[in-house]
């Protein structure tokens, strides 16, 4: 289908088709992503409401389904107030510096076989590099606001994100070792081969079983990376109000939240691709194989996002020193140890990957 569209595009538009096709693919990623964020926020409010034995939003539209539209309109109509004491240029560019890396990562994310904007061989390296850039926007927001609360929140965010990126990096290196590729599509395909996959039990051939500690560390570190509860000391309401976002309002404030929810979707998608078989069904059969792979990936991402929300509803916020201790004294030693174990496992006669 995609090859046919490409050939027809070249025939109709000639040399102008290549940049036009890039633009079309970017729009096809960004627009659904914005809709997903809007309804992820609604799902979060609904799910937490059910966990609290209440209804959640149910007034705007049938079953509250138009609530995200109302929220967007409210934010668009709010005035963006710029305090006089801020460093205006850096203050205004900080939300964009947080949002842009979150959107840029989607260029290499495959949605199913051969459905990806840029199928680069170093896709995993690209993800690691781009995901670490967002912290600069957070630091800049804290510093440019010229507020001690914002600056303290920015410093907390920087330390937390850098600390947990190390553990996430080791987890990704382990996936690289067992799959033998930095290409995200190749990593997914490598999980759907082997003894159990040949029997049709794909779920037992995915990386989540042999790399279970890495699976847990990566996902929990992802929760910390996105500054979500219980790792949200960056915006601890009882201590520093909204942290680095305290001087922002209106749509500028909304951009930080947009980046946060996009990062949640990114962490869930990458976790599904690296550890849960990507777009492969859990069991191979005539019925499951007839369902497009994109829907299987969507189901896995939805379940992981629901875990994000469940964690928020269930756990108290950690103290800052507890978060740092977990990252440096538990996760990093655990990932290094499992990395060594997997390296020995690969070289042993019991190698299950190659």
UniProtKB/Swiss-Prot annotation:
GO terms for cellular component: plasma membrane. It is a multi-pass membrane protein. Keywords: Cell inner membrane, Cell membrane, Membrane, NAD, Quinone, Translocase, Transmembrane, Transmembrane helix, Ubiquinone. The keyword Cell membrane applies. The chain crosses the membrane at residues 22-42, 91-111, 124-144, 168-188, 203-223, 255-275, 291-311, 326-346. Its main location: membrane. It comes from the Bacteria. It is an enzyme of class 7 (translocase). It is found in: Cell inner membrane. Its EC number is 7.1.1.-. InterPro entries: NADH_UbQ_OxRdtase_su1/FPO (IPR001694), NADH_UbQ_OxRdtase_su1_CS (IPR018086). Pfam families: NADHdh. GO terms for molecular function: NADH dehydrogenase activity; oxidoreductase activity, acting on NAD(P)H, quinone or similar compound as acceptor; quinone binding. NDH-1 shuttles electrons from NADH, via FMN and iron-sulfur (Fe-S) centers, to quinones in the respiratory chain. The immediate electron acceptor for the enzyme in this species is believed to be ubiquinone. Couples the redox reaction to proton translocation (for every two electrons transferred, four hydrogen ions are translocated across the cytoplasmic membrane), and thus conserves the redox energy in a proton gradient. This subunit may bind ubiquinone. NDH-1 is composed of 14 different subunits. Subunits NuoA, H, J, K, L, M, N constitute the membrane sector of the complex. Belongs to the complex I subunit 1 family. This is NADH-quinone oxidoreductase subunit H. It comes from Cupriavidus pinatubonensis (strain JMP 134 / LMG 1197) (Cupriavidus necator (strain JMP 134)). The gene is nuoH.
